Amino acid sequence: MTKIDTQDLLWQNISELPYFRGFLRSIEGRYFRELNLQGEVLDLGCGDGHLTSKTLPDSKVQGIDPAFFSLRAAKRLNYFSGLVCSDGDKLPYQKSSFNTIISNSVLEHIPDVDSVIHEVVRILRKGGKFIISVPNNNFTKNLSIAIFFERLGMVRIANSYRRMFNWISRHHHPDPEERWLGRLRDQGLTIKDEWNYFPPEYLKILEWGHVFGLPSWINFKLFGRWILNPSPANYLLKRIYYWLHPFFNGEAKSANGAYTFIVAEKQ
């Protein structure tokens, strides 16, 4: 068996988050890390700060989020150079303030997402990068339980399940890749790179994890921690690591992937 590397992104994420969420974040974190971001970074929708602190440990990062409770958790990390509580459509920064703005699985939760992108462009410097990860329409299409009902001819139940899962995920915009690219271009950004990732076999892990990850939710509600024993001595956690490791090291990029990663630039 592969020896557990407690410094790799997979372990760092699944040892602190529900395994299905940690699995997704570890793959996204790898993409952000591979970009070798330079200078100060704004994390738009930083939440509790877990992803960025694990992914970019040596970067200077400011965080902004509308949820005060999440920002309190982020502050305890002693990682961010600054934290601000604010909505994304009224960013409290001067024009051309940042070279790099990242937003990981955030924009899909915002009803008026175009206003947020407009604000991002305002505070982004010329030549600066806006880097995002968002779900696309493959997320909804590839849900395994919905596909099961469709094969039985139960299309209405399949569609109801898809709506329910988007509601649970708080998705306002599980939109096609082309729609996301269009939103960025409409605000004057140029697409420098983009790809889909998280193919159906990966999405199935995420989907079913919402059921099998229930003990982590109970832990968080009772003790304020998703994982009570985040060490390699935790037998169950170790087995989950060995199970997910081949997926983590495999090719997560896929035209049929449920998420889209985009690197855009302000001209």
Give a label for each model feature.
Residues 51-52, 111, 140-141:
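Glycine/Thr-rich phosphate-binding loops of Rossmann-like dinucleotide-binding domains
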Residues 114-119, 129-262:
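S-adenosyl-L-methionine-dependent methyltransferase catalytic module, highlighting the catalytic core
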